[in-house]
Amino acid sequence: MPGIRRQKHGRGFNYIDPDGQVIRAPEMLNRFKALVIPPAWTDVWICAHEDGHLQVTARDARGRKQYRYHPGFRQHRDGTKFERMFELSDVLWKIRERVESDITLPGLARDKVMATVVWLLETTLIRIGSDEYAKANKSFGLTTLRRRHVAVKGNELRFEFRGKSGIQHAVAVTDRRIARIVQRCQELRGEELFKYLDDEGKKQVVQAEDVNAYLQDITGRDITAKDFRTWAGTMLVAQALRATGPAETRREAEKNIVAAVDVTAKRLGNTRSVCRKYYIHPALLSAYLEGSVLPPLPERTKWSNRKHSGPVLRQHEMDVLAFIKSRLKHDHNKPALSATSQPRSTPQPQANKPAA
């Protein structure tokens, strides 16, 4: 496909148009700068049209294919993130199984550090991070954390940092294996926290693209770190509503939803509106407003987002997935309201049977 190529020139780069001419127009050069293409990337191809959905392809330092999309396309893709939940559910066991295995690798091998980041991603719900945000806004995520952002004391890690939108985060987690790995990463020179040693023993800094490549290597699918936040948001709000139980009136149901969303937003580090719009499956909330809610989880199988109970899906997760699928089928088959029919103002509680 015709496009623009980046070529090394002195300490910087030249950009070559499809006709082989060096691009010098300031507005074009500003556009390329705004794409924030890492200097280490090679075989860089840039779309000739600024509104093309795929803006950049390249190879990273390890030879892996990388992509940059137009923000508008990313917004469209975000609209399908709730569908991506089900794709993640198919392979989450693979990710958890591989993470548990890779954490035990010797030294600070690449896959060991990637597994550690993914473990923390799922356990703490800290954003994956972006070099763009770290440089422009001094806000951090897992892959952009600095050594100063974590304190390790025995088996406990405590992360304190400024996140997206200036929100201050203080997150503690206790795990002996993870604490030891993070402490060893801290001991490597360089301000970045997460680093690994490549096959030649050279230090490499972990980037978000590395973590996504690790997830895609495991699953063979386009799974990214961001998918974990949608998964967690839906599971957390379902957990809160499940504990609250059905409401007696629609007004009470709306209040309960707000409370559940607020708890979830606090865990994710989002505002209520952002959390509700982007990280909670809408079928879950519409079902609750109609009086349909998951029954309480038996005490012996209660699920905690902070505890890993093996690679398989946990009982709460399986229940939520089955519930949402059931609601989607119900909504698909539900006849449209006639001109004379009115929705009930008071929801009728109905309990779904727990999964066997």
Annotate each predicted stretch with a short phrase.
Residues 1-140, 144-257, 261-268, 276-277, ...:
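A positively charged, amphipathic N-terminal helix/segment that binds anionic biomolecules
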